[in-house]
A protein has these predicted regions:
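Active-site beta3 strand of CheY-like receiver
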Residues: 47-58
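C-terminal single-pass membrane-anchor helix
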Residues: 134-166
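Conserved acidic segment of CheY-like receiver
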Residues: 2-23, 34-41, 51-52
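Receiver (REC) domain switch/output surface
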Residues: 117-129
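Short amphipathic alpha-helix used as the core "switch/output" element in two-component signaling
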Residues: 63-81
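Short, conserved "switch-loop" micro-motifs in signal-transduction and mechanochemical regulators
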Residues: 90-91
Length: 166
């Protein structure tokens, strides 16, 4: 597994620290950064995050700050290659659906099982990436084989036309 750079963006410092501790214990090769606002997250994109764990609200520190949903929309417009896992205290299906529609890979409800669910979301994400990688590899192989077959057919036609084969 490549070294992942993970941003945890959560305005609840205790929850962010617990999330960092949990992820660091499960994935010791991850480089993890914590931010309390979407703006801080955006200001640190030069660290090239591969995954962002993003709180839905983000309004405890600064009421005028960008919400988690607004941050998600901004990230997906500007950095579509970054995978985002949303976390929220809201156990509402419409909120989860909205986040996924806006580009979140998964949605985790804060609570007793949040850390395990986040870990499961990471594992699902890694499997998804592997499938995407395999698909790209097979598409490339398919193109190569297609061009090889076309080349063989063209050579056979040339050989027939020149009388090399009957």
């Amino acid at each position: 597994m490549n070294k992942e750079v993970v941003f945890i963006v959560d305005d609840e410092p205790m929850h962010a620290q617990m999330m960092e501790d949990h992820l660091a214990s499960k994935y010791p090769n991850f480089k993890i950064y914590k931010y309390s606002t979407g703006e801080e997250c955006n200001d640190n994109m030069d660290k090239h995050p591969t995954i962002v764990v993003l709180d839905y609200h983000l309004d405890a520190v600064n009421k005028s700050a960008r919400t988690g949903l607004e941050t998600l929309i901004h990230l997906k417009k500007k950095y579509d290659h970054i995978d985002v896992i949303m976390i929220s205290g809201q156990d509402k299906i419409d909120v989860a659906v909205e986040c996924v529609r806006e580009g979140a890979f998964d949605y985790v409800v804060k609570g007793p099982s949040a850390f395990v669910r986040t870990e499961q979301a990471f594992e699902k994400l890694f499997k998804h990436r592997q499938v995407i990688h395999e698909l790209a590899k097979y598409k490339k192989l398919n193109r190569t084989l297609t061009f090889s077959i076309i080349g063989i057919i063209a050579l056979a036609a040339i050989f027939r036309a020149t009388g090399i084969i009957g």
